[in-house]
Regions:
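Extracytoplasmic beta-strand/coil segments of soluble accessory domains associated
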Residues: 74-121
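Gram-negative outer-membrane beta-barrel transporters
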Residues: 186, 439-445, 550-555, 566-661, ...
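C-terminal beta-signal and adjacent terminal beta-strands/loops
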Residues: 122-125, 556, 561, 651-663, ...
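Short, acidic, small-residue-rich periplasmic hinge/interaction motif at the N-terminus
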Residues: 26-66, 107, 115
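Outer membrane beta-barrel strand-and-loop segments of large Gram-negative receptors
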Residues: 355, 359, 365-374, 421, ...
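N-terminal periplasmic accessory domains that precede
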Residues: 73-76, 98-101, 113, 137-140, ...
């Protein structure tokens, strides 16, 4: 349901109108929930009700404390139903750069939010011919100790968030300011038993309290974190080269939030964050062929910092609670400077560092939003949500846009001379959305929704949705949802200045005329679209809980490197462009079970995911490589009020590589048949609180030392680290 007319939304005018209307009718008697964090809840909105749908999981601060991530929040997020870690394609490149994948839709269809605001630093990293980025993703900007909760939204419930949420949404909520002065200092270390695996050290602090009574409060945190790279030879040499192990990372973060309670019914938040994230190079090249690096450059860089991201964020948010409902107005700015060593962009050296010179890609995002929740009960009990969003993103990446040098060649309407191609691209999206949380009678909730987005390049897109929940009695509930979701083209795919090339082997398998290919950006792409459906049955009574959910995503228009010729360059090479592909299907089952073995003492929680189907209907290959099934099981034992332990077990099913050739090189060289067989990982976590302000933790991950090594034969493999020991302490006041 895409529309390409010239209609333009003016969201800033909408925001100003909402602000004027809201401030005119402030209520003095708004009720609070009595919590220190000043989060006020007036009415149950559609957004709140959607978080009760079967495709939603909540990770609490207590969950994180009991099962602490080693370095990245993805360590614990991956244990939710429907979630895995993988690359954005099935071709096996960048095997250890695994990001959050939800329901098999790939990391590029997972939208990351921090306090409800989109985070997009990973989009400053070049997008490769095969659809990968050399990035760790956006799940490592908040230290684990500073997280209040994480919401994992899968399927139709994520549609309200717009572009990029076709798989789902990860919403990371940081801790709010408190009414009394509190502070903490946390230390954490993870020490692998295998000396070839990188260890981790992390320290962070927080300070929170009133600056002027309860009218002005603040929260400040800082974080230092270092995870070393795996040894250069952790994996066996194949084809004359090593597949790199896991890259190391250094994080430095500082974040501040000041909250001003202007009146009992109005709160204004000011936020600022600065992060520096640098890598510790482990030798990875896009195609694991560092042995052909000129002068041995790749080998010489092991252990060095070859890329670093500087991320800054500014935010201003107004929350109002009125006689007619509540409102939220927000403006956020995010700037990412991505500084890295220059790399190749053609053929087998694409993505390989080829210079000792650094270049910087800059990505800026401006995001404004307004939302009002209005309860109505004249004829039927309901809460209507009206909202508007505006987002402007602009990219300046001179290195990636000029890396392919074809001086003197005319490629369609574009010059092959880098100096003639622009390094910049930008896009603006404006949106209006409507939702209604309707309770026609006791036990029934209906949530219709409609979102309209207008993109400066591809035009308009309608995203309707409908979710419902029906109480069946005796503890059973039936829940279902359907939504049309979309993803806009990224700024590399749609940039006229972004040129990639290959001398022949990288051309699509259907092109066999013996010459090379150029791949151009395309300003006429359509949005990717997926119709997501789910149906779930849940049971909850006396501490017991169980549920099973079927989901299906019918995906089309996925943007891929082109296979259709659009012309011939002046040097006789074929001209391709990024294009909208055909259809794909993702289908599966999710299940969960909670058993209170001993009430308030011993709980057993299990969730499982089984993939029925994941394939591109044109190529026959999966969208991404994930296990056929995944089971996560946790036994939580509260031994005393101060002492608790958790035993966790994860079983990953077989992971098969893609089977069908996509490039000419794969015709001449047989594709890898290497697959990762089913395996399990067991962990033990211990937590002890000496006082309410001093606690310690420790444990063992991968107790039985099951290791997986990455292979260098083109398969989608990765390193699963072996047994490791961790310890941590938190001191507060």
């Amino acid at each position: 349901m895409t529309w390409n007319g010239r209609f333009r939304l003016h969201p800033l005018a909408l925001l100003l109108t909402a602000m004027i209307a809201g401030t005119a009718v402030a209520a003095d008697d708004t009720q609070t929930d009595g919590k220190d964090d000043d989060v006020l809840t007036v009415h149950k909105t559609a957004e709140q009700e959607l978080k009760q749908q079967p495709g939603v999981s909540i990770i609490t601060a207590e969950d994180i404390a009991k099962n602490p991530p080693v370095n990245d929040l993805s360590d614990i997020i991956r244990k939710m139903p429907g979630v895995n870690l993988t690359g954005n394609s099935a071709n096996g490149s960048r095997g250890n750069n695994r990001q959050i994948d939800i329901r098999g839709m790939g990391p590029e269809n997972t939208l990351i939010l921090i306090d409800g605001v989109p985070v997009s630093s990973r989009n400053s990293v070049r997008y490769s011919w095969k659809g990968e980025r050399d990035t760790r993703g956006d799940s490592n900007w908040v230290p684990a100790e500073m997280v209040e909760r994480i919401e994992v939204l899968r399927g139709p419930a994520a549609a309200r968030y717009g572009s990029g949420a076709a798989g789902g949404v990860i919403n990371i909520h940081t801790k709010r300011p408190t009414q009394d002065w509190h502070g903490s200092l946390s230390l954490f270390t993870n020490q692998p038993e295998n000396s070839k695996e990188g260890d981790t050290k992390r320290t962070n602090f927080s300070l929170s309290g009133p600056l002027a009574g309860d009218a002005l409060t603040m929260r400040l945190y800082g974080n230092l974190n270092k995870t070393d790279a795996d040894a250069a030879d952790i994996n066996q040499a194949q084809n004359g080269s090593y597949a790199a192990g896991r890259e190391g990372v250094r994080n430095k973060d500082i974040n501040a939030l000041v909250s001003w309670k202007m009146t009992p019914s109005q709160i204004l938040d000011f936020s600022y964050g600065y992060s520096r994230q640098g890598n510790i190079y482990a030798g990875d090249t896009q195609y694991s062929n560092g042995n052909i690096s000129p002068g041995g450059l790749v080998d010489s860089l092991y252990g060095s910092e070859t890329n670093r991201l500087y991320r800054q964020s500014y935010g201003l948010t107004h929350n109002g609670f009125w006689e007619w409902g509540d409102s939220k107005l927000a403006f956020n700015y995010e700037k990412t400077n991505n500084t890295r060593l220059k790399e190749g962009s053609t053929g087998r050296v694409e993505g390989m560092i080829n210079s000792d010179e650094y270049s910087t890609s800059r990505l800026e995002n401006y995001h404004a939003s307004a939302e009002a929740n209005i309860p109505l009960d004249r004829w039927i009990e309901q809460t209507v949500t009206l909202g508007a969003e505006w987002n402007h993103e602009k990219l300046d990446d001179s290195a990636s846009m000029s890396a392919t040098n074809a001086s003197g060649v005319i490629i369609g309407d574009m010059s092959g001379n880098p100096a003639d191609r622009s390094s910049k691209n930008s896009a603006t999206t404006a949106a209006l959305y409507f939702e209604d949380n309707i309770q026609p009678w006791e036990g029934t909730f209906l949530i219709p929704g409609l979102r309209f987005d207008h993109h400066s390049e591809f035009g308009g897109n309608f995203s309707p949705s409908f979710n419902f929940s029906q109480d069946l009695g005796e503890g059973f509930k039936l829940k279902a949802g359907i939504a049309r979701v979309f993803k806009a083209p990224n700024l590399y795919q749609s940039s006229e200045g972004y040129l990639l090339g290959t001398r022949g082997n990288g051309c699509p398998s259907g092109i066999n005329n013996g010459v090379g290919c150029y791949l151009l950006g395309n300003t006429n792409l359509d949005a990717e679209v997926s119709v997501n459906k789910e149906l779930g049955l849940e049971f909850a009574a006396d501490g017991y809980a169980a549920g099973v959910t079927w989901f299906r995503n019918d995906y089309k228009n996925k943007i891929v490197s082109g296979t259709e010729l659009i012309g011939t360059a002046s040097d006789d090479r074929n001209i391709l462009q990024w294009e909208n592909g055909g259809k794909a299907l993702v289908e599966g089952l999710e299940a969960s079970l909670t058993i209170p073995v001993v009430s308030d003492v011993l709980d057993w929680r299990t969730n499982a995911t089984y993939m029925l189907e994941s394939k591109d209907k044109k190529t026959g290959n999966p969208l991404s490589i994930i296990p056929k099934y995944t089971i996560n099981s946790m036994l939580d034992y509260q031994i005393t009020d101060k002492f608790s332990t958790e035993l966790n077990w994860t079983l990953y099913g077989r992971q098969k590589p893609r089977e069908f050739v996509e490039s000419r090189m794969e015709i001449d060289s047989p594709m890898s048949t290497t697959e990762i067989g089913a395996y399990s990982v067991v962990g033990l976590n211990l937590n002890y609180a000496f006082t309410k302000d001093v606690s310690v933790k420790g444990g063992v991950s991968n107790l039985f030392d099951k290791k997986i090594y990455r292979e260098n034969d083109g398969a989608s493999t990765y390193n699963e680290p072996g047994r490791a020991y961790y310890a941590g302490v938190t001191m507060g006041f």
